[in-house]
Amino acid sequence: MLNTLIVGASGYAGAELVTYVNRHPHMNITALTVSAQSNDAGKLISDLHPQLKGIVDLPLQPMSDISEFSPGVDVVFLATAHEVSHDLAPQFLEAGCVVFDLSGAFRVNDVAFYEKYYGFTHQYPELLEQAAYGLAEWCGNKLKEANLIAVPGCYPTAAQLALKPLIDADLLDLNQWPVINATSGVSGAGRKAAISNSFCEVSLQPYGVFTHRHQPEIATHLGADVIFTPHLGNFPRGILETITCRLKPGVSQVQVAQALQQAYAHKPLVRLYDKGVPALKNVVGLPFCDIGFAVQGEHLIIVATEDNLLKGAAAQAVQCANIRFGYAETQSLI
C-alpha cells in the first residue's frame, strides 16, 4: 500500500485526485493539505466538494513545513501553483517521496522558458534534467524509473495525443504549421473567484493569443512548431481542440487512421472514432481523450476532446502513478 499525500487538495483537480486515490486499492491517503494561509485550512474536503460527502470527509490541513507530513509517505501529488510546486518538489524528493506535479514547474527542460512564460527564475535546472514528462501514452518507459513526474498541461495533452502519431509516422507537411484552436471550460482557471470567470461575464473568447505558455510546451515535446490559440468557453469543464494540418502529397485517409490505430490500439484511455468526430459531452467526467478526424485532399482536421480536470490533470497523474508502480494503467480510473 502506497502512503499518499495530496497537496493543494482544495482545488478542482485536487478534489478529483482525492476521488481517484481514495478508491485506489494500492493507495492510502495519509493527509490532504493546503497552504498555511489558505482560507480553506481546517475545513473538510467534503464541505468544499459535496460530491465527496460520506466518501472522503478528511480535513484540509495547513502545511507550513513538509517535515510534518513527509515521514512515511511514498507518493506526493502536487496540485499547486507553479511557484509552489517549484519550491516543494525538491523538498519532498529529498524526503524520499515520488512526486507527481500537476503544475508547469518541471515540464520543459529550459530555464529561460520559465523566465519568459512563467515569470520566475527556475532554481533547479538539475531537476528539469531529471523530471520525466508524464504524457502517459508516449512516455511510459521513462516514468517507470522517475521520482519526479511532470504531468502535462491540459491543452498539451490533447494536442500531443492527436498529433504525435502523425508526426512520428512522417505523414504531415510541417512546413505548414499545425493550427490548434482549443476551447476549455471555466474550471481551467481554478476555484478562485474572479470577475472574468463569473456567470454574467464569461463568454466564448480567445485569450493568450501568441503568448500562452502551453504553445512552447506543445512545440517542445512534439518537436514541431505549432500555432496554438486557447479559448475560454462558457461551460464548466472539458476541452475540445480542432487541429488543422497539411498532409504530405499522396498521404491517404487510410494511412492517417492506421497511424492512430497503431499508436493507441493498446492504450485504453485514448478512444478513436472510426467515423465522425467527438463531442465534449462524451468525455466530461471521464478519464479519456477522444480523437476523430477528416481528410479532404491534402487537408487534415483532427478533433480531440478530454475533461481538462481528468485526462488533462488528475486522471493522467494517477495514470502516471499506475505506470510508475507497475499497476494496471486504468486502476481506479475506469
Swiss-Prot record:
Catalyzes the NADPH-dependent reduction of N-acetyl-5-glutamyl phosphate to yield N-acetyl-L-glutamate 5-semialdehyde. Belongs to the NAGSA dehydrogenase family. Type 1 subfamily. Pfam families: Semialdhyde_dh, Semialdhyde_dhC_1. Keywords: Amino-acid biosynthesis, Arginine biosynthesis, Cytoplasm, NADP, Oxidoreductase. This is N-acetyl-gamma-glutamyl-phosphate reductase. It is an enzyme of class 1 (oxidoreductase). It comes from Escherichia coli O6:H1 (strain CFT073 / ATCC 700928 / UPEC). Pathway: Amino-acid biosynthesis; L-arginine biosynthesis; N(2)-acetyl-L-ornithine from L-glutamate: step 3/4. The gene is argC. SUPFAM superfamilies: Glyceraldehyde-3-phosphate dehydrogenase-like, C-terminal domain, NAD(P)-binding Rossmann-fold domains. It catalyses: N-acetyl-L-glutamate 5-semialdehyde + phosphate + NADP(+) = N-acetyl-L-glutamyl 5-phosphate + NADPH + H(+). Its EC number is 1.2.1.38. PANTHER family: N-ACETYL-GAMMA-GLUTAMYL-PHOSPHATE REDUCTASE, CHLOROPLASTIC-RELATED, N-ACETYL-GAMMA-GLUTAMYL-PHOSPHATE REDUCTASE, CHLOROPLASTIC-RELATED-RELATED. NCBIfam families: argC. GO terms for biological process: L-arginine biosynthetic process.
